């Protein structure tokens, strides 16, 4: 059964499995499964084949049991296959290498026959695992519904035996091996297959938090938690260190399932808990030997805070790639307007900014004689009109509003709103593109909500430059400035989703995405800034910048799949709005981050900076971005001349 109820969480991380250490021969598997399920485990990680088996001509695979001992739903829902651990496809012994290849293919074929959802592959036995990866890659090309989880120890381990001799002669060589490197090498050899995932062995010691953080951008499906990783509390029960608890919470938040593995190291006498045999099946009333460990895992899960309401709303958008809006080329639909209008935080910030501007514009002595002219450019269905009039009421200032909107469908709704609220004497509706309209008078305040996830990516600079002629020389623009930011990320899922399109164009497109399964590798840095009113209205809005990101040394090596983009806007003075992680406006959902992918992920060795170049390019009919990495290795210039992705003027 699930570890517990956590409001809003429907992910697979609610389910906990147990590793079967001994081969359940003959008809034992149903009893082992029944005992585990009755003890509140949800599935087994179980060997499918006798570990003593070696292939011989004409031999029959000594499987754990006939496929008939469990029903199809039980095989699919409650069994994860464990491939024989003796398999060594990079052994120097040729016979062992050949036997390993035959057995691996036989076991995967049997798992496919059983309709298992996943099989766990044994960890690489040495740093060089090219033949292992080659055989697995062959197998992956023939699989449809079966995932292969490569087992990787989550530790900074000593060098493998074959590497010791070389280390003696190289004083610069590190005395530790980063197990992430094993995974990365294997994944690259297998061409980033979306069906190749990771099962992390969590031991008693852990690398640094920065090093651990890399794994949240990788396709980790399970954390195999060893019983020797547990400590003992004052009452004799198993517990985890603070660092292990934090890691476990991170796994739960990233939909990673926990599998408990090992022998019981705690003699907990509670309801007949056994102290030794985790496969005991004789008395179903007796709790599983590893139940105390499961109880503790459930305790960690249940004490997590419920998912915030905003996260629950956004959960179905996690890591889902969307094309950015084209508000100039396209007219937004009613549903899109409605979604944005529900973002009360955004309009509260706008109202605060407008109120401050009104107070600065009109002194208390002049409130009865001065009427402020305010233009909302891109009025949509009227939320900024409402915010402006509420700010005027709040500050006691008189206001004359022009609502300029190019979408004729939105104008219909805008007319209805004005009539319903009785604002006919206060608001003049202009059905026109702001770049074409000739205003009858100059504005004191120009208000717009033309910002995209990257700040300028929905052409706010071009629109506001065109509307700036409406503004008095000392007029106020809200927003007054905005800055874009980027950071390098590991995002294996996003990369594989784009790769599935099998073309270059999708790798040269920027996507709006609710980032979830990612690893943030370095702090954000600013890219482009635009100010309004524009002090040089005739200057080009083209931009170019070069940035260098330093990845913390303790992180180790990493793989960069692309760059996450954000913005921060100054609406007026100290009132800001944005999604840049360090300064993000809380509880605002109008914008997800933007993602700029790389056609080929960039491997970044430890202690090596990343150098990236970004261009904002402008043509007669479109605006587009180009981007490229030049260090530690050069990438192609993405989206050259806007060939794959652009925003139409």
From Swiss-Prot:
Compartmental location: Cytoplasm
Predominant subcellular localization, coarse grouping: cytoplasm
Region TIM barrel, annotated ranges: 10-300
Residues annotated as binding S-adenosyl-L-methionine: 337, 346-347, 405, 433-434
Keyword line: Cytoplasm, Methyltransferase, S-adenosyl-L-methionine, Transferase
E.C. designation(s): 2.1.1.320
Any one GO MF annotation of this record: histone arginine N-methyltransferase activity
Protein name listed in UniProt: Protein arginine N-methyltransferase 5
Organism lineage: Eukaryota, Viridiplantae, Streptophyta, Embryophyta, Tracheophyta
């Amino acid at each position: 059964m699930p570890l517990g109820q956590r409001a809003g969480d429907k992910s697979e991380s609610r389910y906990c499995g147990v590793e079967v250490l001994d081969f359940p021969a003959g008809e034992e598997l149903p009893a082992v499964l029944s005992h585990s399920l009755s003890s509140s485990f949800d599935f087994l990680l179980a060997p499918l084949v006798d570990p003593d088996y070696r292939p011989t001509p004409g031999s029959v695979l000594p499987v754990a049991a006939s496929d008939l001992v469990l029903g199809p739903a039980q095989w699919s829902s409650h069994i994860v296959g464990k491939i024989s651990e003796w398999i060594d496809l990079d052994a120097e012994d040729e016979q062992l290498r050949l036997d390993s290849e035959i057995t691996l293919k036989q076991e995967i074929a049997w798992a496919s026959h059983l309709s298992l959802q996943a099989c766990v592959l044994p960890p690489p036995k040495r740093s060089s695992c090219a033949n292992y990866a080659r055989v697995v890659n062959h197998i992956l090309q023939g699989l449809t519904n079966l995932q292969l989880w490569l087992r990787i120890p989550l530790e900074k381990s000593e060098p493998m035996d074959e590497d010791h001799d070389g280390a003696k002669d190289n004083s610069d060589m590190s005395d530790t091996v980063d197990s992430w490197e094993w995974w990365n090498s294997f994944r690259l050899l297998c061409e980033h297959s979306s069906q190749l995932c990771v099962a992390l062995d969590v031991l008693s010691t852990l690398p640094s938090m920065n090093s651990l953080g890399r794994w949240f951008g990788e396709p980790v499906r399970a954390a195999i938690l060893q019983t020797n990783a547990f400590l003992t509390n004052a009452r004799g029960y198993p517990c985890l260190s603070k660092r292990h608890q934090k890691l476990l919470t991170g796994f739960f938040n990233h939909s990673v399932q926990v599998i408990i593995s090992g022998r019981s190291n705690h003699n907990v006498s509670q309801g007949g808990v056994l102290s030794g045999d985790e496969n005991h099946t004789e008395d179903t009333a007796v709790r599983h030997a590893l139940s105390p460990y499961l109880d503790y895992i459930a305790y960690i899960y249940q004490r997590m805070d419920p998912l915030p309401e905003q996260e629950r709303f956004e959960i179905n958008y996690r890591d889902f790639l969307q094309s950015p809006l084209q508000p100039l080329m396209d007219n937004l639909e009613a549903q899109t307007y409605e979604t944005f209008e529900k973002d009360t935080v955004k309009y509260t910030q706008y109202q605060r900014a407008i109120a401050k501007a009104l107070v600065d514009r009109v002194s208390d002595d002049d409130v009865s004689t001065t009427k402020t002219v305010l233009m909302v450019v891109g009025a949509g269905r009227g939320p900024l009109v409402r915010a402006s009039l509420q700010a005027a009421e709040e500050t006691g200032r008189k206001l004359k509003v022009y609502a300029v909107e190019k979408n004729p469908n939105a104008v219909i709704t805008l007319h209805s709103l004005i009539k319903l609220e009785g604002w006919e004497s206060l608001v003049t509706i202009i059905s026109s593109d702001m770049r074409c309209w000739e205003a009858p008078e100059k504005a004191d305040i120009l208000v717009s909500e033309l910002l995209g996830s990257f700040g300028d990516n929905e052409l706010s600079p071009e629109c506001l430059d065109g509307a700036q002629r409406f503004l008095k020389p000392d007029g106020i623009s809200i927003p007054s400035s905005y800055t874009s930011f980027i950071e390098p990320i590991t995002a294996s899922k996003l990369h594989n989703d784009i790769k599935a399109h099998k073309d270059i164009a999708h790798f040269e497109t920027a996507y709006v995405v609710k980032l979830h399964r990612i690893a943030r590798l370095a702090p954000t840095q600013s890219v482009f800034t635009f100010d309004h009113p524009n002090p040089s209205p005739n200057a080009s809005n083209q931009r170019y910048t070069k940035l260098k990101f330093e990845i913390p040394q303790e992180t180790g090596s990493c793989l960069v799949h692309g760059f996450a983009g954000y913005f921060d806007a100054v609406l007026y003075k100290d009132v800001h709005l944005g999604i840049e992680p360090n300064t993000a406006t809380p509880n605002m959902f109008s914008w997800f981050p933007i993602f700029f992918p790389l056609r080929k992920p960039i491997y970044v060795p430890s202690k090596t900076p990343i150098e990236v170049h970004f261009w904002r390019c402008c043509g007669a009919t479109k605006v587009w971005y180009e981007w490229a990495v030049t260090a530690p290795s050069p990438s192609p210039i993405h989206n050259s001349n806007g060939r794959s992705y652009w925003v139409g003027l």
